[in-house]
Amino acid sequence: MKYRTHKCNELSLNHVGEHVRLSGWVHRYRNHGGVVFIDLRDRFGITQIVCRQEENPELHRLMDQVRSEWVLCVEGLVCARLGGMENPNLVTGSIEVEVSHLEVLSRAQNLPFSISDEHINVNEELRLTYRYLDMRRGDIVDRLMCRHKVMLACRQYLDEQGFTEVVTPVLGKSTPEGARDYLVPSRIYPGNFYALPQSPQLFKQILMVGGLDRYFQIATCFRDEDLRADRQPEFSQIDMEMSFGGPEDLFPIVEELVTRLFAVKGIELSIPFQRMTYQEAKEFYGTDKPDLRFGLRLKNCCEYAKKFSFSIFLDQLAQGGTVKGFCVPGGADISRKQLDVYTDFVKRYGAMGLVWIKNQDGGISSNVAKFASEEVFHEMFEAFEAKDQDILLLIAAPEAIANQSLDHLRRLIAKERQLYDAEQYNFVWITDFPLFAKEEGELCSEHHPFTAPLEEDIPLLDKDPLSVRSSSYDLVLNGYEIASGSQRIHNPDLQNKIFSLLRLSQESVKEKFGFFIDALSFGTPPHLGIALGLDRIMMVLTGAETIREVIAFPKTQKAGDLMMSAPSEILPIQLKELGLKL
């Protein structure tokens, strides 16, 4: 049986007089006194079909029984709609199909929510439980189609650049990469476990050792971590690695790749992208993920804070803290009530309060006006390049707290005051991250333990490891990290040195990474790589509010699958086969 001659978006006045066959879902049903109208929908569009009782009573009776989301196959004659009855909102709005034959392919139960009315706000849990129905509402499938085209563009471009797509194992070894692993028990080796990959990191480096030269993969990765709007327990990344190159070789490739991906949505980007060191990003934006669509740059004002008799300023400076903030152009119109809201807001991030200074008609209005002379305030206005009717917002706190608080505050104010265009795309490379961070008094990797230090900083590994910069880089878009990568360590002695600084014993290294150190010992080319977060890119490209909206079957924020009711208990016999007890 041939189910269709045309899709539901293809018919026009050019087809009038033709007999056609269509298949699809009942989108809307209307009975207008002996005339039944049905909007028949498939993935591509909608066509109105019609049956008149006087012309075909039996068929009219059958169509009158049809309900929403039944699946139909119809045959009929394409006719022009009567004058004034056209629907300009439909591609097929100038025609209708007069049905001569109808077959019900599948019936539908009563729906848990409306498919035809896309404006109804449906609870997300209900949508995820009936994901297959949610897909029929249009947005999800449109985003999946966009994702498909983005993946095609990615594969085509990387193939042009000499990258080979290789699928790496999903069942691997548990290694310390930062987040918790998802573990898979082995039936054949009782008491032993595989780990699902947090990334193909070691495999792709070993591919470089093996001489592949350039690798890529659209990889599924797994991390058992607390979720938020832009995280999922399983996610996709465009994974890349290349030999005999450095960041100056990789950056142009990634920039052109991103340009091709955005071109799928008709978005033109300007390359090369801006660059900024980690230190600059922290100093001027308070974060290593700066949103550059607007100004509100942070400025250190410790030299002016010293001139205040304000104890909070002086105490923080004495304790090694900082005083910094930003200027909001025209912000003198912010009310006291709203400033109180901002004060409560920054307290969420550890700040003790918020200092505000308004430049109004050459005069000073401030909650710390009595603690400094007018001359000091005017010096600060000059330093911040503040004009009349501007406001300075300052925080005195330890550096990390001040940065975090001001980062969130500048984003909030920029959004409230509409300081940027939502359709604006500002990319920036963040480079020269610290190689190490400190956690509970111990060194840990800022990225991962396979990241190479900058060559000029290698002598500092023994003297001052926390000051060592890494040859690593993130690509940030509008405040989102969409890619992260680094030059890799290709010298086994240096790799062992890094493991030693991370307090990994030789026994632990041999157990967890022995195979990898062995691989590095057989002649390893200099290599580097990057991984682009496909889900995050799709979230930005499609304007989705969460990553869940760009994944076909996402998990909830509690890592649950509501449609399949997973995770779920397993049978006692399955536990026994795996040698496990609960």
Curated annotation (Swiss-Prot):
Q: Where is this site: Important for tRNA non-discrimination?
A: 32, 84
**Pfam families, A to Z:** GAD, tRNA-synt_2, tRNA_anti-codon
Q: Which UniProt keywords apply?
A: Aminoacyl-tRNA synthetase, ATP-binding, Cytoplasm, Ligase, Nucleotide-binding, Protein biosynthesis
Predominantly, its location class is cytoplasm
Q: Name the residues that bind ATP.
A: 223-225, 232, 481, 533-536
Question: Which Gene Ontology molecular-function terms are recorded?
Answer: aspartate-tRNA ligase activity; aspartate-tRNA(Asn) ligase activity; ATP binding; nucleic acid binding
A Gene Ontology term for the protein's cellular component: cytoplasm
- Under Enzyme Commission nomenclature, its number is 6.1.1.23
Record-annotated residues binding L-aspartate? 177, 223, 447, 488
Enzyme class, broadest EC rank:
ligase
Subcellular localization is given as: Cytoplasm
Keyword match Methyltransferase = no
Report if keyword Chloroplast is assigned: no
Reactions mediated catalytically: tRNA(Asx) + L-aspartate + ATP = L-aspartyl-tRNA(Asx) + AMP + diphosphate
NCBIfam families, from UniProt? aspS_bact, PRK00476.1
**Family the UniProt entry places it in:** Belongs to the class-II aminoacyl-tRNA synthetase family. Type 1 subfamily.
Assembly notes = Homodimer.
This chain belongs to the protein called Aspartate--tRNA(Asp/Asn) ligase
Q: Which species does this protein come from?
A: Chlamydia muridarum (strain MoPn / Nigg)
